[in-house]
Amino acid sequence: VMVGGRGDKTLNRSLNRASNDIARQPGSSIKPLAVYGPALDTGTYSLASAIDDAPYYYSGTDAKLVTNFTKGEYRGLMTLREALTVSQNVPAVKILSKLTPQVGYNYLEKFGISTLVSPKNAINGAHDVVQSLALGGMTRGVSNIDMCSAYAAIANKGTYTKPIYYTKVLDSEGNIIIDNSVPETHKVLNENSDWLLIQGLRSVA
């Protein structure tokens, strides 16, 4: 599948917005993958766990205030389900801080996010094992296909299936050259945790 943009077509097989050709900051859409899914899957939190939505600072020497979408707005104690429903930033950062950013990073790897930057491969000192990962602040962003396949894993009872562009390649005589008919899969979330995450996401609607 090729997904283009606006303007006149000037090249063939150039920029494909559906694939890894382009990546953008995911923002709050990363929260279920890096924060709430891991929080439920590790058993550290439940949908009813209380988190205090109050002024909170990132750790480190350059500690900055974590802001919600509406700056200066704090809702006090709220459940994880409520924090997910209204997409509050402070609870998400607090939860990831307790889990540790490394845990969130590891889950994103399992969800098939291919653009992650590890501390070992930092770009000008920037990497993704940081608290701001909870809010989608990523060094290289995320591609559409990675996000789609990650969310598909949630819909598939926590099982990730590596996306493919074709199932088979045949030669002129019908012989199979490449066979992708059996996809690569692995478990990311256990089914109970995945069910809870889906219930939380349904509250958003």
Language-model regions: role of each:
Residues I22-S28, G72-G76, L80, L84, ...:
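Secondary-structure capping and boundary motifs in well-ordered enzyme cores
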Residues V1-I22, R140-A205:
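A penicillin-recognizing enzyme superfamily signal
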Residues R6-T10, Q25, Y56-Y58, M78, ...:
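Solvent-exposed loop/turn segments at secondary-structure junctions
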Residues M2-G5, L33, A48-A54, R81, ...:
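Generic beta-strand/beta-sheet core signal
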Residues Q25-I51, A83, S149-I154, L197:
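Active-site SXXK
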Residues T42-S46, L99, V103, L108-T115, ...:
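A generic secondary-structure signal for well-formed alpha-helical elements
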Residues Y45-G104, V130, S172-S203:
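Conserved catalytic neighborhood of penicillin-recognizing serine enzymes
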Residues K64-N68, T100-M147:
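Mid-domain, small-residue-enriched loop/turn segments at the edges of structured enzyme/sensor domains
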